[in-house]
């Protein structure tokens, strides 16, 4: 498993910033579906989120709120492009879409 290039600290939620004492933290592959989960793993494009509140079930979680999901994808795309020296076109050629 590749390390996240987004977060070194796995004990704090990427969205709310609170620590794991609130609830367990889960790994979230930012880009998923159609083989993109494996690409997220390969390039370290994953964040750590409170499993229920911020990841899966909360009204502002990445899996329930399209706006939050899109904002996380845009932020991570910027970081990945800077880290790997990709252009927008190169990012699209790998992940199939521009989130900026």
Language-model regions, residue ranges each:
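General structural signal for secondary-structure boundaries
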Residues: 21, 42, 51, 86-87
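Short Cys/His-centered divalent metal-binding micro-motifs
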Residues: 46-72
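Post-HEXXH active-site segment of zinc metalloproteases
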Residues: 41, 70-76
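Short, flexible, mixed-charge glycine/proline-rich loop motifs
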Residues: 1-9, 39-44
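Intrinsically disordered, low-complexity segments enriched in small/polar residues
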Residues: 31-33, 56, 65, 83, ...
